[in-house]
């Protein structure tokens, strides 16, 4: 017999099945909610669109057929903000992390920020070169996990995978915290509300990513490129003013820093190493491109390698530029506000980028930077 209509009460017998009473029938199409329909043989077709299905369609969009997966592959201009946003956004706090550590020894040690930044930049250069080889040797997208598993065994692969999971969680936490801190430096009304704002931003970013890699890439491309433009504009604008003979000083340049202790000899060496490791936050997210090689347009490996080269050159330039500008303008920061001698009562300590922007008279651009940081991946 033929498959019954929606009002019928039974389905046809399938002779290919071992028992003649076992039935199959493909339900009729009821439009875009077809995948959410249900029916029962012997009872009739039930038309129930579940709440979860409707919510999934609204939030995540329509699922793509397998033959349309090629439409989600990313060109370099979109892949850069998608996979490199972690590393690029680290510029917003890597310099500050170095200075906060060195500030424990007082103002005199802040001059070591440039050496720490140079060491971090060199490590980033080496890491980028290494990952450029990885994307050619392991183009399947396994990244560090695949490299460790193939060469060292499954146990080492699991260790690497666990480390990556922890790294991803910390990256989100630190990046969002930095974004909210930059916003709070510009808008006093946000002080005391950092945690709720950060949680709301994480939820928003999660929803954008669940829409799919191409959709999220389009959403992230504009703010990430605008963030890079804002940072480069700030650095170039300050460089032009310095070249013309202007003296740029941060508002915190007249404040003294009370050292937490006296560091010399071995203690100073360990403090310098700690500053270097803190600055290595600038390396966060470099591995994301090697994990996402399958998402690139063909030739996948070559495009991934080019994106890595762009990431390395842009991130190193911005990171070193922000660090040099912080030293030239004599930005003073400390872990504890009480350590800043001369800071006005009730004044909230600003981030390094906020201080630099204020010095170079680019306040409106910093506001843009802070908003962009909240929208990155």
Question: Language-model features: where?
Answer:
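Extracellular/periplasmic helix-exit of transmembrane alpha-helices
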Residues: 239-249, 308-349
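Helix-loop-helix junctions that connect adjacent transmembrane segments
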Residues: 225, 232-284, 342
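Membrane-interface "cap" regions at the ends of multi-pass membrane proteins
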Residues: 38-95, 102, 129, 140, ...
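Membrane-interface loop-to-helix entry segments
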Residues: 205, 210-244, 307-310
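Membrane-water interface regions at transmembrane-helix termini and the short interhelical loops
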Residues: 132-137, 185, 202-224, 294-298
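Positively charged, low-complexity/disordered segments
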Residues: 361-377
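Hydrophobic, membrane-embedded alpha-helices of multi-pass small-molecule transporters
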Residues: 80-92, 257-301, 305-306
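Extracellular loop-to-transmembrane helix junctions
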Residues: 98-149, 153-161, 174-201, 312-320
